[in-house]
Amino acid sequence: MIRINFAYRHSLQTAVFVLNEGGFCRKYGLEGIFNHVPNTQEAEDGLLEGKYNFIFGNHVEPYLDRVRRGEKIIYLAQASNYWPDRLVANPEINSLEDLKGKKIAVLAKGDHPELIVRQRFRDVGLDIEKDKIEEVEVEKINMMKAYKMVLEREVSAAFMLPPFDYKAKKDGLKVIELSPFPQIWGVTLATTSDFADKNEETVMNVLKAFVDAIHYFTTEKKRTLEILSKELTDALELEGDAIEHLYKETVKTLEKKPYPTLEAIRNLYNLTLVAYPEIKVINPLMLWDLHFLRRLDESGFIDGLYK
């Protein structure tokens, strides 16, 4: 078996757990080693140094490093194409406009989740600085910490992913639905162009394992819930109903054929461009290498999983 080191960023990259625990790497001749690496730069440096062969996540930094250091990180596949966040807030908050002059919890200032928060405010005509919305940073992409800050009224609100909307309703917090936001996020399979060029068969086998795991996730609910319960009960302090809610919401977003959409790519690029204008010299499609996925798709492999 070929040993492959993966890095994943956070506990809501649920398809990664199924890829690992479901035995899909072994099925395609791979020994998958899965490393939890919350820090963005640590994950990316590990990929560039060869410590990791693939990473799941890292959506802003590859554009910056392409400009600043000439690094050649590429994206191979995208599991989900829209960001399913909700605003979890204290009961007196009824809209984003009510957050003027208030505190909100944010994950990783200057990084992807916080850039999305800024875009959410821009979409309704607000500006974090001008409208005196104070961002309180939560380190290490710790969504449970952000949630507890709202619950304990340290902040007025936080933009949260499922299942924290479910927990919020049970705990008496306000959950405000937001418009669907096409976005590259979460389980994005990335490597370097050098590794892909030198290891084409391995890349194809990783993609086979990846799409097979997505198929399993969407069609084998009972076993997938068992895997998620094992991984998330302690990590995110979740109970059975919350995990089932997370499962249902995740299935809605997963792509059977994990191609990115142009709208999701554009939105990621644009919100990164606002924060880091230097990336304007890069075409947003420059980082995407989909020929491996297309080859797998045209072979009939993905369609065959769903027959």
What are the language-model segments listed below?
Residues 1-139, 156-160, 175-183:
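Short, glycine-/small- and polar/acidic-enriched structural segments
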Residues 22-23, 50, 153, 252, ...:
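Short glycine-centered helix-capping/turn motifs at secondary-structure transition points
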Residues 26, 67, 122, 169, ...:
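Short polybasic/polar patches that bind polyanions
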Residues 42-46, 143-149, 164-165, 246:
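Short, hydrophobic alpha-helical packing/hinge segments within bilobed ligand-binding/sensory domains
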Residues 81-87, 185-189, 193-194, 268:
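Small-molecule pocket liners
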Residues 145-234:
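Pocket-lining segment of extracytoplasmic ligand-binding domains
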Residues 199-280:
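Secondary-structure end/capping motifs
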Residues 269, 273-307:
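Conserved C-terminal helix/tail region of periplasmic/extracytoplasmic solute-binding proteins
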